[in-house]
Amino acid sequence: MTNALSMLGIFSDVQNEIEGKDYFVEKDGVKFAGTHLLLDLWGASNVIDPELIERALRDAAEAANATILHSHFHHFGPDGGVSGVLVLAESHISIHTWPERDFAAIDIFMCGVCNPYHSLPVLKDVFAPKTITLSEQRRGLIP
């Protein structure tokens, strides 16, 4: 089976394990690609240390039973924020932090049997926000 990535010469070690599986989700009689959680963490701690942030996102992915493929994190200087992403076989988790505002924006998009809600306690423990705003989107709704 040819896909767009293989046409570009990009291959994943996980490709053979997941090829042919349907990772769409069915919930409440609706079928869709996956659940995308958008989190705004206000009054958050630990928003400067890229190693701690990467560990937190890895722990969050593991709590959701996701498969981590790659990670990349960038630190914007000693007192600057961090932007980073975990690429998952089931989609991604990304973060952008603004330490000057004690703020972190986190996206968790997962398909298949992973449960992105299981990531939330891990993130709450690490970042200890005063306020959390959470919204859920069902991506790829089948008409």
Where do the protein language model's features map onto the residues?
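Polybasic/polar functional segments that serve as interface/processing modules
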Residues: 1-143
